[in-house]
Amino acid sequence: MPSYLLRSAIAALACAAAGAFAQQSPITISGAWVRATVPGQGGTGAFMTLQSPQALELVGASTPVAGVTQVHEMKLEGNTMRMQHLSALALPAHQSVTLTPGGNHIMLMDLKQPLAAGSTIPITLQLKDAAGAAITQTLQVPVLQQPPAGAAPAAAHGHHGS
């Protein structure tokens, strides 16, 4: 009987470990990059494509290279595109959501140093599932002058009046 209990305990631990691993990798991320900066530039953007097998919300992000990191959207107000903070960005199950220059993106503000092309920075995504449970995922993101080949194009800004 003790060996049965030991096997049951090992099986339970294996299931718990598998569940914990699933929580660590809730989304697939592709094409991630951060736009390089020049000395004196206070902010830049991070861009990527996100896909999740379950409905999630991107509720924030953080990085040690910026004093403030927020999820932003571009919104047309009258004839002007304006950037504004989003409290949550929906990531529908099994659908790709692309963060692009000129569209939804992660804004890095109050940069602590210039971000040189060729370097890599950590960004931690803050997510919530349908039950409200917090999930984080940290990735290493390359700093580039231009989008990588195959990255989604910048969002169209539309017609700005005549």
Model-derived regions: residue spans:
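Compact, glycine-rich, soluble single-domain proteins
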Residues: 24-162
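N-terminal signal peptide c-region/cleavage motif recognized by signal peptidases
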Residues: 17-19
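Absolute protein N-terminus
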Residues: 1, 22-23
